[in-house]
Structure formats: structure tokens, C-alpha cells
């Protein structure tokens, strides 16, 4: 029995055409000159037997034919005759068979290579990139232009750079936020403009379709009424319809025409008005070829007014896409609505600026009332609190508060107090020290120095000199600067009352500067509540009877109602009121004890 080759079924070759390993071995032995019995044991393995069969020319031709048949059955254009059968061919055929249901290119092939995302090849449109330079590295990082710190950044994510500006460069962060808001407003305006233009175009198309039968009906009616004018009427109607549905080369939409139902005039008048209105509009603006078909004849003055109005509207500088619609009265309301989009956005932006300014002033007032440094604004706890309570509010840094916002608040308070002093004739004047402690501004320190010289050991001799200085300051108040004018606004009675009170308690009993500041705040509080008796009644405040020393009454009033006054200021903050500081409250208690000993 002849031994069959084990690789015949794999190659698809019939057993009759494929020689057995014994025959191949015998042939190989005969070729080598060896004689002997041939068997399968001659070869060390089945693969060696198959390899010996490949050397046969007949087998090689059969293999070539089988390979060509396989390539033809697979249908791959890249495998032609003579292409060797390899593992890649089968793998490619298997992959193609599996991906037949997918549409498109296959990832990982030469037609659709795998992309390796590396930043730097696209245009940077984000506003934050003006403060960063992109590093040409695979890590996708950016370098800050201010502090040269490397920040992780990609083309689609700028969160890291924005956080870096918010935490390290507050002013630049505010500029970026303003630029982003402006760009957002511009985009909203563009979207609104495009939407409005789309609606106007749709309405124009609808109006044109609705008005088409009117022109035809008018032409038919005129042709029936006047046989002699039928040819001219049909020509006019056809020209009107062709000009009405003429496509605008700029936008690609038909030009609008306001056509009203015809009234019962004579056929000759209607045809005349139709041709006149058409020629008039074509002479005014031949590009757009828009017209208004009037049904009744009008006077010469009304026609001139209508021509002037349409000419002004057409020559008004505006968008080319909307200029063609201004001649139609049906679209005039839409154009007015379009013009009101920009003021509405400006109003919202202006309102946000005003709200932010109010919050700035309230924070500055909190710093003044609590006597806290401006650096407290930079603490992460306060910033996170404001970020949670007011997400849209961008808090400036502590340096901005100290350099700009707090001085602005002090100037505003100074103006209000000066207006209160000048406008209230029945009120006792308030000195400038009501606004500040010893560290507010240098102008108030100068006033304190002048008043400290006033309360020296010889009070009686220096009172006359102080009176002369006040008279000179009142005479030169118009030519002095802000500091000297503020000093001259001090009332003479108030100065006399302070000098008399200091002489009463003793010139060296308390530090002069701190005492002047305390008396200024006490005078302000007493004046505020004494002019508001309904507030005193509502708060059930203790009333102090007048004494020989006015400041003694004021000091006793503030001391008796100190807790009520503090609660009132805390609940209803007012720019005209400044609360007592902690050291001033302690000094007030000592002053009251000292007055009780003297009395």
C-alpha cells in the first residue's frame, strides 16, 4: 500500500497527482546514486518528507496553479500571478473579511495612519495664549511669559493656564476675562444677526409667493376691462413679476416687493402708476431692483417725500445683506429690532460693571469697618467663599484694593461728609478726623498735628491764635488745595468745644491724637442720632440731658448706647457712620471714668 502525503489535503491537491514520500525518497536516492529500499522512516520527520517533495518540478507547477487560484478567489487587487503565498496575504484577507460591515477607512493602515497628537500645529485662538509661549515638546507644555513657569497645556484645553493666571497674575487674569467676555458678546451679536437675517429672508420668500397671484390677477382684470391696453398691461405685469422674482447676486434671494390689493381705479391709471413706481425704484437703486407698486395716485409732495425717505434709507451705511430690505415697509420693524440688539448687550455689560463696582465698595467698607489689612483679600478662604456665593464676580487682588478701591471709597466718604456739613445749617459741624484714624491719609495727620499744637499748656493764649488762623483759612478757601479746604471746613464752635473739653479733663490726661480722633467719631455719632429722633425712639436709646460741656453729653450718650449703636451700624451700614475701633472703645471707657471722677 502506498503511503499518502499528509500535506495533500492542506494544499488542495489530489492524491493521484501528489507523489508519496516513499516515491520521492526513492527518486532522491536514485539521483544520489544510492540503491536500497525506500520507506517513510528514511526521513527524520514529516516536514522533511514534505520539503523533499517541494524540490519536484511537477509539484512546484501545481503549487503555482493553486496559489493563482487562491489569489483569484480572494479578489485582492494587489496579489497577481506569481505573488508568493505568505501569512500576510491570509491575514490581510481575514482582516478584510471581518471589516466588511464597517464603512470608511481602517485605523492603523497606510490609508488611515494612527495619529499621534502633539500640540503646536494649529492656530491658537484662545485669549490666554497672549501670556504663554508653547514649548515644542511632546509633553504639550506652555511657558508663562511673566514668571517663566511651565504649565501643562494642549490645543483643546487651556484650563491650566487660566488657573495659573488666576492664582499668580490677577491683573492679567482680569484682562483675559474681559477679552473673553467681549468675544462672547461679539459672537452672540453675530448669531443674533445671522438669525434675524435668516428670518427676514424667509419672510421675503413667503411674501413673494403670496403676492404672485395678485400681479397675475391684476393683469387679467386689466386685460378684460380694456382690450386696447391688454398688451401693455401684460407686458407691465410680466416685467414686474420678473423684476420681483429676480435673484440678488449678493444673497441669492428674491427682492421684496410690497404689493397691495388693487383699488377700483381706471386701467390706464393703474398701469401708469405701476410703470412709474417701477422706473423710479430702478433709478434709485438699480442693483437690488426693489419697487413699491401703488394702487392709488398720490400728490407730487407725497411722492417727493417718499423718494427722499427711500433714498436716505438706501444710502444709510449698513450691512449689504440687510440694505435691500429697507425699502419694504413689512421689514421695517425687523430692522428696528435688529438695531436694538447691540444696545441691549451693552446695557447688560454696563449693569454688570456697576454691580461689580458696588461689591468692590462693600468689600472696601468691610475692611475699613473691621480695620483689616487689604492682604486679607488674597487669602484662599475668602476667595473660595466669594467664588461660591458670587460665581460671576471676579475679585481683584489686595494690592488693587489698597492702591485704588479703598482710596476711592475714602474720597467718596469725604465728599459726602463735606456735603453734609455745608448743606445742614442746623447741625453742628463735623471735623475731618471723623473719616479716619491716625493712619487713614496724610492730610488728616496734618490736621491732627495742627490741633495738637492747639491744646498745649497755655490754652487760653493759643485760642486767639487758632481763631485768627481759622479766619485766614476761611478767606483763602477758594485758592487752597483739597487738604487746606478740608481743614478750613471745621466749625469754630466745634474747635472751641474740643479745646474747652480738653482743658476740662486735663491737657495731659490722654494722648492728644487719639483723643481728637475719638472725639470726632463721638461727635459724628451723636449728630447722626440726634437729628433722627424716630431712630432713637425705635431703638429705645437712652437720652442724656445737656450739660455745661457739650462733649460731655455726647460722650455719655455714646457710652450709654454703645451696644445699640454697634448693632445698628452692623445691621444697616451707612456711609455717614463710622464705628468705634476696639482701642477707641477702651479709651472711651477710661474717658468716662475720668469724667465721673471730675464731676
Swiss-Prot record:
Expressed in neuronal cell bodies in the ventral cord and HSN neurons. Residues 70-104, 208-283, 440-491 are annotated as: Disordered. InterPro entries: Znf_BED, ZnF_BED_domain_contain, Znf_C2H2_sf. One of its GO terms (biological process) is vulval cell fate specification. Residues 440-455 have a biased composition (Polar residues). A zinc finger (BED-type) spans 123-176. Probable transcription factor. Involved in vulval organogenesis. During vulval development, may play a role in the regulation of cell cycle regulators such as cul-1. Positively modulates expression of homeobox protein lin-39, perhaps by binding to regulatory regions of the lin-39 gene, acting in the vulval lineage. Plays a role in larval molting. This is Zinc finger BED domain-containing protein 3. It comes from Caenorhabditis elegans.
Amino acid at each position: 500500500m502506498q503511503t499518502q502525503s499528509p500535506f495533500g489535503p492542506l494544499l488542495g491537491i489530489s492524491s493521484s497527482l501528489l507523489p508519496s514520500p516513499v516515491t520521492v525518497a526513492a527518486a532522491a536516492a536514485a539521483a544520489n546514486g544510492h540503491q536500497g529500499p525506500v520507506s517513510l522512516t528514511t526521513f527524520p520527520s514529516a516536514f522533511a518528507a514534505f520539503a523533499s517533495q517541494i524540490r519536484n518540478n511537477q509539484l512546484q507547477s501545481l503549487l503555482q496553479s493553486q496559489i493563482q487560484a487562491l489569489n483569484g478567489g480572494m479578489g485582492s487587487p494587489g496579489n497577481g500571478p506569481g505573488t508568493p503565498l505568505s501569512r500576510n496575504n491570509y491575514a490581510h484577507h481575514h482582516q478584510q473579511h471581518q471589516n466588511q460591515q464597517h464603512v470608511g477607512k481602517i485605523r492603523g493602515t497606510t490609508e488611515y495612519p494612527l495619529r499621534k497628537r502633539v500640540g503646536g500645529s494649529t492656530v491658537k485662538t484662545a485669549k490666554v495664549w497672549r501670556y504663554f509661549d508653547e514649548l515644542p515638546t511632546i509633553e504639550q507644555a506652555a511657558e508663562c511669559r511673566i514668571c517663566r513657569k511651565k504649565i501643562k497645556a494642549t490645543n483643546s484645553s487651556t484650563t491650566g493656564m487660566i488657573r495659573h493666571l488666576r492664582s499668580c497674575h490677577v491683573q492679567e487674569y482680569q484682562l483675559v476675562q474681559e477679552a473673553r467676555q467681549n468675544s462672547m458678546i461679539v459672537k452672540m451679536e453675530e448669531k443674533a444677526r445671522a438669525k434675524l437675517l435668516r428670518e427676514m429672508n424667509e419672510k421675503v420668500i413667503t411674501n413673494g409667493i403670496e403676492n404672485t397671484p395678485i400681479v397675475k390677477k391684476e393683469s387679467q382684470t386689466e386685460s378684460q376691462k380694456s382690450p386696447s391696453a391688454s398688451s401693455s398691461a401684460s407686458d407691465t405685469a410680466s416685467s414686474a413679476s420678473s423684476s420681483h422674482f429676480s435673484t440678488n447676486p449678493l444673497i441669492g434671494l428674491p427682492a421684496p416687493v410690497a404689493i397691495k390689493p388693487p383699488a377700483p381705479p381706471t386701467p390706464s391709471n393703474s398701469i401708469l402708476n405701476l410703470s412709474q413706481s417701477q422706473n423710479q425704484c430702478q433709478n434709485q437703486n438699480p442693483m437690488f431692483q426693489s419697487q413699491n407698486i401703488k394702487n392709488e395716485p398720490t400728490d407730487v409732495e407725497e411722492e417727493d417725500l417718499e423718494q427722499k425717505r427711500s433714498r436716505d434709507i438706501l444710502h444709510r451705511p449698513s450691512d449689504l445683506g440687510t440694505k435691500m430690505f429697507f425699502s419694504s415697509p413689512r421689514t421695517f420693524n425687523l430692522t428696528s429690532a435688529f438695531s436694538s440688539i447691540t444696545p441691549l448687550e451693552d446695557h447688560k455689560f454696563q449693569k454688570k460693571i456697576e454691580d461689580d463696582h458696588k461689591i468692590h465698595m462693600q468689600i472696601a467698607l468691610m475692611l475699613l469697618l473691621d480695620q483689616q489689612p487689604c492682604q486679607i483679600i488674597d487669602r484662599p478662604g475668602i476667595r473660595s467663599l466669594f467664588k461660591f456665593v458670587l460665581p460671576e464676580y471676579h475679585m481683584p487682588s489686595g494690592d488693587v484694593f489698597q492702591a485704588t478701591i479703598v482710596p476711592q471709597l475714602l474720597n467718596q466718604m469725604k465728599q459726602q461728609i463735606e456735603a453734609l456739613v455745608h448743606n445742614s445749617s442746623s447741625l453742628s459741624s463735623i471735623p475731618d478726623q471723623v473719616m479716619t484714624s491716625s493712619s487713614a491719609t496724610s492730610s488728616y495727620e496734618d490736621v491732627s498735628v495742627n490741633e495738637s499744637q492747639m491744646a498745649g499748656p497755655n490754652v487760653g493764649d493759643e485760642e486767639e491764635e487758632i481763631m485768627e488762623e481759622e479766619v485766614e483759612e476761611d478767606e483763602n478757601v477758594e485758592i487752597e488745595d483739597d487738604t487746606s479746604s478740608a481743614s478750613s471746613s471745621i466749625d469754630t464752635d466745634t474747635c472751641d468745644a474740643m479745646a474747652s473739653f480738653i482743658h476740662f479733663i486735663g491737657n495731659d490726661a490722654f494722648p492728644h491724637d487719639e483723643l481728637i480722633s475719638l472725639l470726632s467719631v463721638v461727635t459724628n455719632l451723636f449728630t447722626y442720632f440726634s437729628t433722627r429722633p424716630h431712630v432713637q425712639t425705635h431703638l429705645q436709646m437712652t437720652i442724656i440731658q445737656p450739660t455745661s460741656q457739650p462733649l460731655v453729653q455726647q460722650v455719655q450718650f455714646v457710652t450709654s448706647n454703645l451696644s445699640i449703636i454697634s448693632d445698628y451700624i452692623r445691621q444697616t451700614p451707612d456711609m455717614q457712620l463710622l464705628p468705634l475701633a476696639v482701642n477707641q472703645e477702651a479709651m472711651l471707657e477710661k474717658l468716662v471714668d475720668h469724667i465721673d471722677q471730675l464731676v
